[in-house]
Amino acid sequence: MEFTAPVSSGYTVYGKSDCSFCEKVKDLLTEFNETFLYINCDEYLIANKAAFLQFIEKLAGKEHKTFPMVFSSAKFVGGYSDTFKKLIETHAD
């Protein structure tokens, strides 16, 4: 199975069903008028969870097993809290 890579501009959010922080990060990005691609990872996790987590680890440069998994311009940001901090810093002006 091929996994969808993060987009080169804007945000990419890897999420899953029944994930409250996945919903919160989508709301947060919308509130800050940021464009984002949301990828529901339910099928990835069912088909091959280990391979998906390896894919994320390779992209992120470190292990990250919790959702959401957020990238900005294909660079790993982290989860909800990290994304919130980045948005506050970016929009501080």
Roles of regions detected by a PLM:
Residues 1-39:
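Local sequence-structure signature of Cys/Sec-based thiol-disulfide redox active-site neighborhoods
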Residues 16-17, 44, 75:
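Structured loop/turn residues at secondary-structure junctions
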